[in-house]
Structure formats: structure tokens, C-alpha cells
Amino acid sequence: KRKFVGLDAYKQVIDSGVDVVILTTPPGFRPLHFKAAVEAGKHIFLEKPMATDAPGLRSVMESAELAKKKGLAVVAGFCWRYHYARREFFKRIADGAIGDVQTMYATYYTGPVKPMPPDSARKEEWSDIEWQVRNWYNFTWCGGDGLVEQAVHSVDKISWLFGDEPPRSAVAVGGRQRPNNSGNIWDHIEVNYLFENGARGFLGQRQIPGCHGENNDYIYGTK
């Protein structure tokens, strides 16, 4: 009675008498699930990322405004915002410990997270949608990509450093280095953020096996 299956299972969960909803399904579904939970008056843990495309993000922002009006608790899955040491670190930076911040370079270099299985693993009765949802990480509509689904933590820290003000511009390049005809996500992306004060944030994201691994943040100030 407490287990629900299917693409509409979220409705049954919300209507089952719960007080809090934890949204951790593939992020392509997050805007729809968030909207339904807010409209039902539920408190929510909203895992990152909140969406995989611009329409989804706009929907999430609208739902967030409604949640505020209803007085609902919404906690986002950007874990570093709740890390005491990291919070103290960013506070000291904001207080001028290294002078005026000029640049942040963030790296998110790892191996593949959920490699796409071979086509032979697909059962005959599975539709294209079921196959893609089962392998959601490898399809942009359902999982975003390595930048959206994983390195968004680094994007969040860059935003945090610069006062959560949106950048003036963001220029990116990327592609697929490995020969792989399954799925459609890129395996490497580089982004250059320019902020209003002239400071820049750089983000390097890559998920290729057998390469150097690193998840670091380098911040440079005037001191």
C-alpha cells in the first residue's frame, strides 16, 4: 500500500497522507513533481539539479514563489551550503581574507557516473521512453549531462562566491571525445563566466575513464 510504480506514481505518493516529499527522481521530472508537491501543500527536499532545461527552470522558480506564499519548507540539495567548514571558508573570503576576488577556477574531472549499457541489455518489451528512463543519466532531457547533474555543485560554489548574482555572460565549449553512439550527453564541457565587476569564474567538467581525476576549487584574490 505504500509503494507506487509508474510515471504517475508521484501523484499517489503526494496523496498518500505524507507531510514531507523527497524529490530525488531523474531531474527531467523534477519541475513537474515539485509543482505538484507545492500545490498539494507539502514540505519538500528538492535534490539538485532542479531541471534539465530552461522551461523546467522557469517552472521551478514559479513553484518556489508559490511555496514561499504558502509558507512551505523547501530544502535544496546543494550540500556544500550546509557544510560548516565550507560556510566558514566562504564567509572569510567574503570578509576580505584574500582581498577582492578576481577569479575562481573549479574542476570536476571524474570517470563516467552511469555508463550506458549495450543495446543487448534492452528487453524487447521496453519502449524507447522506458529504455531512456532506466538509463536516464545518459540522455539530456532526463538527466541533463555531467555539468547539469554532477558539476552543478561547482556551478553553485562559483555562484556562492560571487554573491549569488547571475553572471553577465557564460561562454561554453564541449563535446564527446569517446566513440559512443548510445545516449546523447557530452563527456567534457568548459565554461567561462563573466561577472558584472569584471571577475571571472572558470569551470572544467569531464567524465572520461582512465584520466586524471580532480574536484577542486582555486580562488585568486588581490592579496
Whereabouts are the PLM-identified features?
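Short glycine-rich, flexible loops that bind phosphorylated cofactors or substrates
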Residues: 12, 29-30, 113
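Active-site beta-strand termini and strand-to-loop segments that position acidic
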Residues: 192-197, 221-222
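Loop/turn elements at helix/coil->beta-strand transitions in domains of secreted/extracellular proteins
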Residues: 17-21, 39-43, 69-73, 99-101, ...
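Predominantly a Rossmann-like dinucleotide-binding segment in NAD(P)-dependent oxidoreductases
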Residues: 69-76, 80-183, 193, 209-218
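Phosphate/diphosphate-binding loops
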Residues: 201, 207-209
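Beta-strand-loop-alpha-helix segment that lines the small-molecule cofactor/substrate pocket
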Residues: 27, 31-82, 96
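A structured beta-alpha segment of the ubiquitous adenosine-cofactor-binding alpha/beta core
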Residues: 2-23
